[in-house]
Amino acid sequence: MIPAHDPGPASGLAETLPAIPASAGALIFDRAGRLLILKPTYKPGWTIPGGVMEADGETPWAACRREVREECGLDVRQARLACVDFRPPRPGKPGGLRFLFDCGAFPDDELAAIVVQPEEISAYQLVPVRAALDLLRKPIRRRVKAAWRARGTCYLENGRPVPGVTQ
């Protein structure tokens, strides 16, 4: 219900709204359909390019582009939203929203020029999607698998499709 009179920011409404952390990731392919995956230095397993949105009001799309540029030097110019995943809070973890963008196939010369950020990334590889699913960390694996299967935009909760929401 919308109040008849909006008291404005002094009402304290902003302080009662949830602060939801968010991150954005990128699905980047080569012309053969292989997926770019990265091996982070700060956690086990493989992941995709991406990371946390900045607290200064950065948008999911801007975060995706920034993280890809920082982590592997690629310039993402276009994409489609592949997935939004709501992760509920857990003990020691704030939860939040995870955005996944399908950035399409990059030209071979751009992929050959990848330069990883050595403080964060120790290796990268282009692998068939099915093989990538075996290598990716579990939460990201679910998201990538759902987006790959949907071939369109999907909505997930905790990495799983939601009954009643068309995928």
What feature does the model see in each segment?
Residues 45-46, 85-89:
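Short, solvent-exposed loop/turn segments at secondary-structure junctions
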Residues 30-70:
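Conserved Nudix-box catalytic region and its N-terminal flanking loop in Nudix hydrolases
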Residues 1-25:
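Acidic, metal-coordinating catalytic segment for phosphate/diphosphate chemistry
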Residues 24-26, 81, 99-103:
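A structural signal for short, well-ordered beta-strand segments
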Residues 53-77, 87-139:
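Unchanged
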Residues 44-46, 118-167:
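Nudix hydrolase/Nudix homology domain
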